[in-house]
Swiss-Prot record:
Residues 190-813 form the USP domain. It is linked to Leber congenital amaurosis 19: A form of Leber congenital amaurosis, a severe dystrophy of the retina, typically becoming evident in the first years of life. Visual function is usually poor and often accompanied by nystagmus, sluggish or near-absent pupillary responses, photophobia, high hyperopia and keratoconus. LCA19 is an autosomal recessive form characterized by reduced vision in early childhood and severely reduced responses of both rods and cones. The modification Phosphoserine is found at S28, S29, S508, S526. Catalyzes the deubiquitination of SPDL1. Plays a role in the repair of UV-induced DNA damage via deubiquitination of ERCC1, promoting its recruitment to DNA damage sites. May be involved in the maintenance of photoreceptor function. May play a role in normal retinal development. Plays a role in cell migration. Its EC number is 3.4.19.12. Residues 1-28, 418-443, 479-533 are annotated as: Disordered. Gene3D superfamilies: Cysteine proteinases, Zinc/RING finger domain, C3HC4 (zinc finger). The gene is USP45. Residues 515-527 have a biased composition (Polar residues). Zn(2+) 1 binds at C38, H40, C127, C130. It comes from Homo sapiens (Human). This is Ubiquitin carboxyl-terminal hydrolase 45.
């Protein structure tokens, strides 16, 4: 008798239906990497029927919605969540839409199943019968073949489909405009081809393409031999210097070409291959075409462009002085180079558009001395407050802080929070040793603040420079050393900078040598991104370093470091030379002045009255209110007050003959973050991705964001480009939305096509106040367009405001 092989005993159907059990994340629907083997694939897919259907119909448009021709606010309403039936080629809106035409199509009575559909934006395959997502790797080849065909067809037919959709919009628009006596405007929006999981890049670039101030300023520097006039500070008593700039760097040139090409909307979707390849040379982490984080991409891009521009300005200043060296330059030349360089590096277009400033104010409760730290930011990361029921605190813990909060309630207005009291136990338990050491380091930095210090922003010690940068730094160092004492050197060498790379993440190629830090980090927030390494940043984290009163040293700080950070790597045109630099080699982007004249009553004053939140409110204003609320530094977070320590030491010396050194005096303190310089373009980042213990999760709660945002309640009274009592208004013009889960999602953009603000453009390009800027432009409302890679759709304003925003782009209008 023949015995069967036990490995072949199971029927083939049972083998296919078996799939691994993987725990689901609470916010993720795509944790199963291997996918599902579906038994309906054989009967629910017809390649010939699909090819015939898509040739006869519009691409990525719900045919039923198109038949209904529904208009809202004069615009054709068409959803971007389109699913295609792989049996007959029917295209319908998804189950999350109002009409649910795709689901209705499946439920219609038929002899053959129409249960397998594919999303034409994210390319997710779904089976209604199995109620599961399918994978092309675990099913028959026909599934992979039809997906490949549809993706190729999408890149070819996107332009014609959009033009036919726009004709329907224009027909309706022309009818309405004839009745109103107006004209219909052409939309200056162009789709961007997806190179392979590059939706995170496309969404950001759509918003930058609608940043009109960026294109205006780039037009000034696009050509070689461009003249730049540098005005030194009045203290230097030097005449303005006109320098001739060389050609822009390769990434800057690629960015200019890309933004210029985005205006040519009649040519169809644009391939960003040239710009993306240039960025990958600077940041190799993007080479693998994996899903990345849009905020991180934005930081890398602006950081790299700014580095090229500052090097360009630096080289032009050295050329104006016949390229001096440390041996040939005299003291007078060094002083001039520093004076012109200090103002010259600030004239790059990235700083003029995107950079703002945060001021952290710390006040000792005992001696009432105040210290400030000024920190530049490229965006502000705002935590999203979730609706969770908090556990009741023990009476002992309640009473511990009640007296202080009650006694100080009448003295200081505004929301007061106690730092590091309600941290989840899970987060404490699973935090890495590096996170703990970083937290200890940050606390020590905060405690080292005192009233007698001026503190400024310090950056990475390992800086990459080319030949001109090294020569520039050498000139600065040789001059600074003449005025530095050995004590100053020892203090500066004791300063350490922060690394944003988590211990669990693996740095890529050239990034492993020097990790990311630099100016263009978020002003707060966990930089946790989906499908990428984790970059946890604590709220309001600042870097501190002591600054002496030497004017030469301050100038050296302003010019020495023209290489922002080591994130920009892989550039073969520059020498890779990383040196540990002391404080005189670090860039002081904005002049940080210690506020000695502040009284305790005025230390935390804002431009206007504090914003009043409502119950259960979740909006940009409430997030900003939470971000700028006052904190109490107490318990383990007490401030090491050097002024109190100094007074105690003095008292001991007067009352005792012993010369024993007094231990540091720790006191309760108040701390608050406020905006002290507002940028022309404000970028807000909503922290939707979090690490809870060992798991990752996404916060899907909707955050309300206004079309017009008043930033005055969150600005300090000493805000550099605003006055007390004035409004600081910003208009919304761009949104980056993330849909999906932590492990698999899709980035899209909402952009507002509008008339450029003439007053704002003149104000930003000329760097001076323009008469009439006090009054907001009386502009037209503009038109919102939803862009998903190459797919474009005109949407009503209400649709844009209902988006699950991840990044928000605001431009200043008042």
């Amino acid at each position: 008798m023949r015995v069967k092989d036990p490995t072949k005993a199971l029927p083939e159907k049972a083998k296919r239906s078996k799939r691994p059990t993987v725990p689901h994340d609470e916010d993720s629907s795509d944790d199963i990497a291997v996918g599902l083997t579906c038994q309906h694939v054989s009967h629910a897919i017809s390649v010939n029927h699909v090819k015939r259907a898509i040739a006869e119909n519009l691409w990525s448009v719900c045919s039923e919605c198109l038949k209904e021709r529904r208009f809202y606010d004069g615009q054709l309403v068409l959803t971007s969540d389109i699913w295609l039936c792989l049996k007959c080629g029917f295209q319908g809106c998804g189950k999350n839409s109002e009409s649910q035409h795709s689901l209705k199509h499946f439920k219609s009575s038929r002899t053959e199943p129409h249960c397998i559909i594919i999303n034409l934006s994210t390319w997710i395959i779904w089976c209604y019968e199995c109620d599961e997502k399918l994978s092309t790797h675990c099913n028959k080849k026909v599934l992979a073949q039809i997906v490949d065909f549809l993706q190729k067809h999408a890149s070819k037919t996107q332009t014609s489909a959009f033009s036919r959709i726009m004709k329907l919009c224009e027909e309706k628009c022309e009818t309405d405009e004839i009745q109103k006596g107006g004209k219909c405007r052409n939309l200056s929006v162009r789709g961007i081809t997806n190179l392979g999981n590059t939706c995170f890049f496309n969404a950001v670039m759509q918003n930058l393409a609608q940043t009109y101030t960026l294109t205006d300023l780039m037009n000034e520097i696009k050509e070689s031999s461009t003249k730049l006039k540098i005005f030194p500070s009045s203290d230097s008593q030097l005449d303005p210097l006109v320098v001739e700039l060389s050609r822009p760097g390769p990434l800057t040139s690629a960015l200019f070409l890309f933004l210029h090409s985005m205006k040519e909307t009649e040519k169809g979707p644009l391939s960003p291959k040239v710009l993306f390849n240039q960025l990958c040379q600077k940041a190799p982490r993007f080479k693998d075409f994996q899903q990345q984080d849009s905020q991180e991409l934005l930081h890398y891009l602006l950081d790299a462009v700014r580095t090229e521009e500052t090097k360009r300005i630096q080289a032009s200043i050295l050329k104006a002085f016949n390229n001096p060296t440390t041996k040939t330059a005299d003291d007078e030349t060094r002083k001039k180079v520093k004076a012109y360089g200090k103002e010259g590096v600030k004239m790059n277009f990235i700083d003029r558009i995107f950079i703002g400033e945060l001021t952290s104010t710390v006040m000792c409760e005992e001696c009432a001395n105040i210290s400030t730290v000024k920190d530049p930011f490229i965006d502000i990361s705002l935590p999203i407050i979730e609706e969770r029921v908090s556990k009741p605190l023990l009476w002992g813990r309640m009473n511990k802080y009640r007296s202080l909060r009650e006694t100080d309630h009448d003295r200081y207005s505004g929301n007061v929070t106690i730092e590091n009291i309600h941290q989840p136990r899970a987060a404490k338990k699973h935090s890495s040793s590096k996170d703990k050491s970083q937290l200890i380091h940050d606390r020590k930095c905060i405690r080292k603040l005192s009233s007698g210090e001026t503190v400024t922003y310090q950056k990475n010690e390992n800086l990459e420079m080319n030949g001109d940068s090294l020569m520039f730094a050498s000139l600065m160092n040789s001059e600074s050393r003449l005025n530095e004492s050995p004590t100053d050197d020892s203090e500066k060498e004791a300063s350490h900078s922060e690394s944003n790379v988590d211990a669990d993440s693996e740095p890529s190629e050239s990034e492993s040598a020097s990790k990311q830090t630099g100016l263009f980090r978020s002003s707060s927030g966990s930089g946790v991104q989906p499908d990428g390494p984790l970059y946890p940043l604590s709220a309001g984290k600042l870097l501190y370093t002591k600054e002496t009163d030497s004017g030469d040293k301050e100038m050296a700080e302003a010019i020495s470091e023209l290489r922002l950070s080591s994130t920009v790597t892989g550039d073969q045109d520059f020498d890779r030379e990383n040196q540990p630099l002391n404080i005189s080699n670090n860039l002081c982007f904005l002049e940080g002045k210690h506020l000695r004249s502040y009284s305790p009553q005025n230390a935390f004053q804002t431009l206007s009255q504090s914003y009043i939140t409502t119950s259960k409110e979740c909006s940009i204003q409430s997030c900003l209110y939470q971000f700028t609320s006052m904190e109490l530094l107490m318990g383990n977070n007490k401030l090491l007050c050097e002024n109190c320590t100094k007074n105690k030491q003095k008292y001991q010396e007067e009352t005792s003959f012993a010369e024993k050194k007094v231990e540091g005096v720790y006191t309760n303190a108040r701390k608050q973050l406020l905006i002290s310089a507002v940028p022309a373009v404000l970028i807000l980042h909503l922290k939707r991705f979090h690490q809870a213990g060992l798991s990752l999760r996404k916060v899907n709660r909707h955050v309300d964001f206004p079309l017009m945002l008043d930033l005055a309640p969150f600005c300090s009274a000493t805000c550099k480009n605003a006055s007390v009592g004035d409004k600081v208004l910003y208009g919304l013009y761009g949104i980056v939305e993330h849909s999906g889960s932590m492990r698999e999602g899709h980035y899209t953009a909402y952009v507002k096509v509008r008339t450029p603000s003439r007053k704002l453009s003149e104000h930003n390009t000329k760097k001076k106040n323009v008469p009439g800027l006090k009054a907001a432009d009386n502009e037209s409302a503009g038109q919102w367009v939803h862009v998903s890679d190459t797919y474009l759709q005109v949407v009503p304003e209400s649709r844009a405001l209902s988006a699950q925003a991840y990044l928000l782009f605001y431009e200043r209008v008042l």
